[in-house]
Every structure is written in structure tokens, then in C-alpha cells.
Amino acid sequence: MKQIQVRKVPYGETFSVFGDKFVALDYINGKVLAIRKEIWKNAPFDTSGVNDLRTASITGHLVQYFEDLCKNGASEDTVTMNVMDLKATDGSREYGTFGMRAGLLTLEQYGKYQDIIPLADDWWCLATPWRTPNPGGRRSPSTDVTDGVWSVISNGDYGYWDAAGTCGIRPALYFASDLLVSIEDEGEEDATDGETALYQEYREYIKEWSGLETVMGESPLTFEDWKNDRED
């Protein structure tokens, strides 16, 4: 294993920090968005069947997860606030936004990053409500499917999930960009059958890029962007 700044981890690649493994997704406002590589644990989104993350029981588990990371060296300086947009499927913003150190991806974020997020072995929850009781200030609030949240199936598809049902928790976090994390060094693993010469060349690009004096805020190209740039 070797250590590099988390902002230098290619999107879609796995890194280790604070005793856990994550997949780098994006560089946003000076922070690196990442998701836990695998499901952490299973629990209801909310034991009362309410799809509002601001009051949902799942937040207690997410707080516990961050506390566990802190036992392994994390802090509020290295794991910044994840402010989630709780916009419902129809675009209503009755629930507003909600911030936690360890949060969940939204449906919109999953749609953006799904191609680089590893599949999990079970369903896992997203932060996005299926719909909310009073979108647009209705005079008669509805309870129809307001117990539903979006979730991701083990094959990568996504759909409706009852908030009271047990589902996987896969925390999403924003890391300080200069945080040192560990990645697997090329010399420590044998090439797998699925690795092509092109991907090996990409790994060399990452290795060289990591050793350069880069400007704060820069990150390496994703594999797809690197391929496209190479072909131009």
C-alpha cells in the first residue's frame, strides 16, 4: 500500500482510511465525495415508516458510523459536512436540506456516479424520498406512498423501498482534499485477467500524476476521460 492525498485518487478507485474502504466519486468545492465500498449494516430507514431523513431513525446509525471512524483517527476537520438535498421525485423540496458528517447519496447523485460505484450484495438506501406529504403546500396533505424512499438494488437498478423495511446503509462522506489515504500499489498485486494493457497504461498515468507538483483542487482524469483524451 502507498499513501497519497485523497484528491489524487482516480474516480471509481478504492482507497483506505480510518479503518475502512471507500470509492472516490468526485471533487466538489475543495472536498472529495466518496462512498463506502460495501454496505456497512442493515436497518430500517425509519422504524416509524417516515421518509424524512431529518427525523429518520437511520440517522442514529450514521452518527454511530462517524463515531466509529473517529475512533480510528477521523475528525470534523478530515470529514466535512455532507449537506444532502432532500428533493423528492417530483422535484418538491418540502424537506429542504439536511447535513451530517456521514450521510447518504441522493437519487440524483447515484444517477451521476452509478457507473463507478461498485455493486453491493443487497439493497441499500438513498436519501431521496419517493414523495412528500404536502408538496407545493397542498391544503389536504396526502399520505399516499409518503412512506417510500429510493433505494438501489444489488444489480445496480433503483426503485421504491418502504421506509420501515430493513435496507442496507452505505455511508457517503466528504473528505478534506489533502487527507492522506492508502491505495494499493501496483507492485503489491498481480494483474487480474480482466486488466488490459490499456488499463495498465492508465495506472502508469496515475502513478506519474501522483508524483507531480499539482495545483490545489486538481484531480486525475477518470479512466474514461483519460481514454478519450488519449484518442484525441
Residue spans of the language-model regions?
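Acidic, low-complexity, intrinsically disordered interaction modules
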Residues: 189-232
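Collagenous Gly-X-Y triple-helix signature in extracellular proteins
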Residues: 1-187
